[in-house]
Amino acid sequence: MYLFYQLILEIFQIMSCQNYQSYGCGTYPCVTYGNCYTTCASPCLPYPTNCVQVCTSSQPCPSPCPIPVPCPVTIVEYITTAPTATTIESSPTGMALTPIPVGSTSIPSGTVTVITGYAATPVRSIGGITLNSALGQFTVPLAGSYLITGYIGFSYNAVGIREVYVYKVDGATSVITLISTDSRNTTATNPTYISYSAMDYFNAGDRIFIAAAQNSGSTITTTADNRIAITRMNRQ
């Protein structure tokens, strides 16, 4: 029994001298028996010669994930005025105004009048929007959501109502779609102004135009201080 306990003690003494060495890929199972820093009752055994590395070589650290780079922002903006008056014919007095019918590829008579008379030189033009001054249509160069804002002034006439429409023309099919409208009663003594805004998705080559209608019973004209701004919102 004494010999058994002595054997156990020597085993623990040997284990206390083991100095495991760690590497980048893990810990070797081989141990260093020499140069132990632990005081041992028995001398440390020599370093074994049959050690076998069981871990795999450590792989190089992967490159860090690249910082996301935002998509380049393409600014598309067009601002202009319409100082030249557009003559707006009247619908029958007291009758509801008629916008362009759904699915139309042209503007039927007796519906709306397209605003023209835009300035030849815009206030600002960035990104390639073009104006067809004869048709009063703006063509967008890039796909995306566009915000259209502006206002139309109607010369003084105390009768009837005034309406403004924002239309989109499909560049591939020429189908006209109403995307926004607003309506006002005429003012008693001054020109009537209507502000408008609309936002919609446009494909490259689609077109925008503004139209108006009124039912005063006589033709009226737009004022000289009309304005429109078209801005791409840089989102899909």
From Swiss-Prot:
InterPro entries: Tumour_necrosis_fac-like_dom. One of its GO terms (cellular component) is virion component. It comes from the Viruses. Keywords: Virion. It is found in: Virion. Its main location: virion. This is Uncharacterized protein L688. It comes from Acanthamoeba polyphaga mimivirus.
